[in-house]
Amino acid sequence: MGLVVFFFLGSAKPTFFPEDTAVAINKIKIEITGLSTVGKYNCSNTFTVKDTVYVNSIKKNTFNTDIKMSNFDCGNKIMTKDLQGTVKVKKFPNSTVCISDIKPIGKNYKCRLNFFITDKTLKYKDFILYNTDDKIQGTLSLKFSDIDLEPPVKMAGLIKVKDDIIINFSLYKN
């Protein structure tokens, strides 16, 4: 009898651990938004990438991507040049986003996020990624001063960029 129970239960798969899930990514969009004394600004960088985000996986549970800072476009050459100067694009041409330990939380995901920009690494332990039909997206609220940068000031102080910035990133699914 014990042998029968062992074979019956021994081949059972535990149901309390969700299956690994692979999400194929084909495009990434990063947007930096903020305010200045003359209004709102929005700078974005969209690029093609072929990669996979593994959810709830022990095998490969890290997603890394490099972001070329010179590819950001603010819709206006002067603003784009100001952003590139502010983030020191000549000294730090790339930023890196590393998402790891990705776990489902309802229909969304919780993860660890490391964002390496200039020579600083910002670490977020329980970062929420929102899952929609066509993309996975997250939002970081931070300050230029968090990464030891000075917001741009132009025209003898008439135009000042506020310290607060929002970074939205979207990982588009295949």
Where are the predicted features?
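Bacterial N-terminal signal peptides
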Residues: 2-10
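Low-complexity, acidic/polar, glycine-enriched regions of mature
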Residues: 12-174
